[in-house]
Amino acid sequence: MSSSQTLVVKLGTSVLTGGSRRLNRAHIVELVRQCAQQHAAGHRIVIVTSGAMAAGREHLGYPELPPTIASKQLLAAVGQSRLIQLWEQMFSIYGIHIGQMLLTRADLEDRERFLNARDTLRALLDNHIVPVINENDAVATAEIKVGDNDNLSALAAILAGADKLLLLTDQQGLFTADPRNNPQAELIRDVRGIDDDLRALAGDSVSGLGTGGMATKLQAADIACRAGIDTIIAAGSRPGVIGDVIASHPVGTCFHALETPLENRKRWIFGAPPAGELVVDDGALSAILERGSSLLPKGIREISGNFSRGEVIRIRSLQGRDVAHGVSRYNSDAMRMIAGHHSQQIGEILGYEYGPVAIHRDDMIVS
């Protein structure tokens, strides 16, 4: 088996309905089977699903509603519960639990809420639960909507620390022209860097029941690739498409990231000006440098500056040596309260906890 990968799979309305007005259960069953197969092989799968409005419209018997935001939110409110129930039923066949996450732009733009969403998503994955993500269309206004699930899936891939993002659609990938009206159109296999010429190829096509077209998929690919995540646009009807993407077989159009997620994260941590500083004792210093450990509150001697949870801070030794930079799990006020204490005491001291470490090893770059 190849090393474990984290794959975000985005399923658009056109894939879930097969181009009809109702959810195509047989098609969804096959996609879940593929996901379950990769889950059993040790890979981590995240689903970003569209289809709430389509499910709501089907459940209500295709009512004639005015094309207003309120009507769309009504359909989403009715359909979301039906949609998540369908995913739950399908994955339960394979003994796999799912966890629903409904997000809005506000959840991803506010640092504290972003970190909470990230922690929830990664906790689901760590416990072998498949996250099923959708935008919270029933309450989202234009000001707080991500806008489409293509861009939402790119943000979910960043939250999950994904290796790859797979955008499944009713097309094989990105073509040199629209294949529906140009028989000479050729599939573009590999893309390294998205420019205006490529965006022009994407056009503004949108399926009848969805909100995304090829243009939004390019936006999503650009976001993900900038974060070090390879992105693939492929046909949801292609047999074994999910396994082929995991195995890095040629599928659809692959947008290659110019750097790995780790390299991207290192660049961000090194480049961010430290918002504060921690001085650690010799035991913590040894654990960080010699054993590659996380920084525990017990080893913190001094704290300087005022910083928020999720900001980059500097770690120094008692002798003043610049040891590392890392992302703080706690704000400066909380850090001052737990410094010098055992991790088991964090919850008792603060009344809450974001885990046993002050800075996790995965969020730390040694100088």
UniProtKB/Swiss-Prot annotation:
Single GO MF descriptor: glutamate 5-kinase activity
InterPro entries: AceGlu_kinase-like_sf, Asp/Glu/Uridylate_kinase, G5K_ProB, Glu/AcGlu_kinase, Glu_5kinase, Glu_5kinase/COase_Synthase, Glutamate_5-kinase_CS, PUA
Cysteine disulfide partners in this protein: none
Enzyme class: transferase
Residue positions binding ATP: K10, T169, D170, T211, G212, G213, M214, A215, T216, K217
PROSITE patterns for the chain: GLUTAMATE_5_KINASE, PUA
Recorded metabolic or biological pathway in which this protein acts: Amino-acid biosynthesis; L-proline biosynthesis; L-glutamate 5-semialdehyde from L-glutamate: step 1/2
Amino acids binding substrate: S50, D137, N149
Keywords: Amino-acid biosynthesis, ATP-binding, Cytoplasm, Kinase, Nucleotide-binding, Proline biosynthesis, Transferase
Primary location class: cytoplasm
GO cellular component terms, A-Z: cytosol
EC numbers, comma separated: 2.7.2.11
Protein origin, superkingdom: Bacteria
Domain spans labelled PUA: 275-353
Pfam families, alphabetized: AA_kinase, PUA
Biological process according to GO: L-proline biosynthetic process
Reaction catalysed by this enzyme: L-glutamate + ATP = L-glutamyl 5-phosphate + ADP
UniProt subcellular location: Cytoplasm
Family: Belongs to the glutamate 5-kinase family.
Role: Catalyzes the transfer of a phosphate group to glutamate to form L-glutamate 5-phosphate.
Protein name, entry field: Glutamate 5-kinase
